[in-house]
Amino acid sequence: MLRIAVAGGVCLCLLLPRLSRGGSSLVPPLQASSLIEHDTAVATQQPGPHGGGKTTAYSFFARAPDLQLVFRKRALHHGAAIGYHRQEEDEIYYIVSGTGELTLNGARSVVGPGTAILTRPGSSHGLRQVGPDDLVIIIVYQQSSGVRGR
């Protein structure tokens, strides 16, 4: 049986186990709750991490118990930046729209829609919005030490 509940703008979908005909075992076994979230429900205005300017952060699944993956969308508004910083875990940026200036280990390059960037532990990087449109990116990394920043 599928049960759907809406809490605080978040749709919680839970697949409940069914009893077998004999009533002695669960088929299928109980699984962790799955979530569906819309960006309008999780959007927050924030300064650019490690940098400055205005951004909108969309922290998807931040309240999901035991999720070790961070999946976020961030819109860097005019002149905003994710400041240059040293990376402590693998992190992926994917440029959805807009234009940015990426600094990766001291080298600068212009990035735009369709660009994927992998930063590895020990490397340093920063990203700044340039051009007329917001720079919209997807950020994915494995959560460490219970911190869900960026």
Regions from the language model: what does each represent?
Residues 7-18:
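Bacterial N-terminal signal peptides
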Residues 65, 121-147:
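Ligand-binding loop in jelly-roll beta-barrel domains
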